[in-house]
Amino acid sequence: MQGVYPAIITPFKDGKVDYDGLQSNLDFLIENGVSGVIPVGTTGESPTLTPLEHEQVIEKVVEFVDGRVEVIAGTGSNSTSEALEFSQYAEDVGVDGVLLITPYYNKPSQEGLKRHFGEIANSINVPIVLYNVPSRTALNIEPYTIKYLFEEYSNITAIKEANPNLSQVSEVLDSCNIDVLSGNDELTLPIISLGGKGVVSVVANIAPKEFVQMVDFANAGKFDKAKEIHYKLFPLMKLMFIETNPIPIKTAMNMLGMPSGELRLPLCEMAESNKSKLQNALNNLGLLK
């Protein structure tokens, strides 16, 4: 995996998934050069989708994308059997890979993680992208566990690394050849400089062209040009997490007239003071017309 993979939002309208809006957003991203899309992850509000909605969104994304870019579907869970069912379904409807978050809340041991991911890897054929995000799961996939999984299972090929500890990233890249994608927009360039391949991005939902240019420059070793784009987008990167993701990105998309719609409880609308900051950043970037 290499390039920019937006973690896409799930647009809602009147309490239901807005599939017309979803198709419009996908076309916009693909037209602006992204390498792939990642539906039904954290940014896609997967915790508040019903199991049927989760599967339907995956199927519709595969249909709408129609082979133009990769579709890496979020199929993780803190239940191995549920993650396995979602992953098998995603494979059956034609995804190019699955994204598996570290089990959250029940906090398995590293041995439990090996068995969890191994059980799924043995049951599907499509590539698996591990997703390490300790800030949400209260659990880190240790570098030795990542190395073990990469070497033991041929279809575990990449990791979305959202642990901001660059020592961990260095240790992983030094120990094995797994593809590392940044799980934090603002750490994209540091991770690529260490040997990473790209980013699973939130900001790319609204600035895909700029993110693709930045990552392409970085992967070509043109870090001076990449840094110019990084610092241009940096204020927006920070604001995307001024409140819980995906509240800021969905708010920004609504401001820009893009299909986004409401959030599902327990997530709710952004505080007015933060909306003003976000609007100013969008204005400064020339995104608001």
Curated annotation (Swiss-Prot):
Q: In which pathway does it act?
A: Amino-acid biosynthesis; L-lysine biosynthesis via DAP pathway; (S)-tetrahydrodipicolinate from L-aspartate: step 3/4
Q: Name one Pfam family in it.
A: DHDPS
Keyword terms: Amino-acid biosynthesis, Cytoplasm, Diaminopimelate biosynthesis, Lyase, Lysine biosynthesis, Schiff base
> By its UniProt entry, which PROSITE patterns does this protein fall under?
DHDPS_1 (PS00665), DHDPS_2 (PS00666)
**Stored CDD domains:** DHDPS
* Residue(s) at site: Part of a proton relay during catalysis: 42, 105
Coarsely, its chief localization is cytoplasm
Which positions in this protein are listed as binding pyruvate? Answer: 43, 200
The record's EC number reads 4.3.3.7
- One GO BP annotation of this record: diaminopimelate biosynthetic process
Q: Where in the cell is it found?
A: Cytoplasm
Active site per database record: 131, 160
Record's GO cellular component terms: cytoplasm
Citing just one GO molecular function, the answer is: 2-dehydro-3-deoxy-phosphogluconate aldolase activity
Its recorded reaction(s) are: L-aspartate 4-semialdehyde + pyruvate = (2S,4S)-4-hydroxy-2,3,4,5-tetrahydrodipicolinate + H2O + H(+)
Q: Is Lyase one of the keywords UniProt gives this record?
A: yes
Entries under InterPro entries matching the protein: Aldolase_TIM, DapA, DapA-like, Schiff_base-form_aldolases_AS, Schiff_base-form_aldolases_CS
Alphabetized SUPFAM superfamilies for the sequence: Aldolase
**Keyword Transmembrane belongs to the record:** no
Q: Subunit structure, briefly?
A: Homotetramer; dimer of dimers.
Family to which the UniProt record says this protein belongs: Belongs to the DapA family.
Per the entry, what this protein does is: Catalyzes the condensation of (S)-aspartate-beta-semialdehyde [(S)-ASA] and pyruvate to 4-hydroxy-tetrahydrodipicolinate (HTPA).
The name of this protein is: 4-hydroxy-tetrahydrodipicolinate synthase
Task: Give the source species.
Answer: Methanococcus maripaludis (strain C7 / ATCC BAA-1331)
